[in-house]
Swiss-Prot record:
Amino-acid positions noted as binding heme c in the UniProt annotation, renumbered to this chain: C20, C23, H24, M86
Coiled coil: none
Mod. after translation: Binds 1 heme c group covalently per subunit.
Modified residues (N6,N6,N6-trimethyllysine): K78
PANTHER family to which the protein is assigned, alphabetical: CYTOCHROME C
UniProt record similarity statement: Belongs to the cytochrome c family.
Gene: CYC1
Protein name, UniProt field: Cytochrome c
């Protein structure tokens, strides 16, 4: 996959609303939905949001979430963590992933 490059947080916010927000919240104290709240994700490993029921695959994967790993994961989640229950086909365009990850970095702090 293409390496992560800083993108547009504004475009990333739109992508989050249209592609992620139906299953995830990202603000501090946001509830878990179908997927876990993503606040603080960049200081965690996969399968570690408190109070969320993960698949064993996510817990075992031990992915440390940083810009490059998040971008790679979002390209094809089921290939990156086989057995994940995240029902998302992925973002194929590197630019979209860069924008989304740039937004997530800011919004999840």
């Amino acid at each position: 996959p293409a390496p992560f490059e800083q993108g547009s947080a504004k475009k990333g916010a739109t992508l989050f609303k249209t592609r992620c927000a139906q299953c995830h919240t990202i603000e501090a104290g946001g509830p878990h939905k179908v997927g876990p709240n993503l606040h603080g994700i960049f200081s965690r490993h996969s399968g570690q949001a408190e109070g969320y029921s993960y698949t064993d695959a996510n817990k075992r994967a031990g992915v440390e979430w940083a810009e490059p790993t998040m971008s790679d994961y979002l390209e094809n989640p089921k290939k990156y963590i086989p057995g994940t229950k995240m029902a998302f086909g992925g973002l194929k365009k590197a630019k979209d992933r860069n924008d989304l990850v740039t937004y997530m970095l800011e919004a999840s702090k």
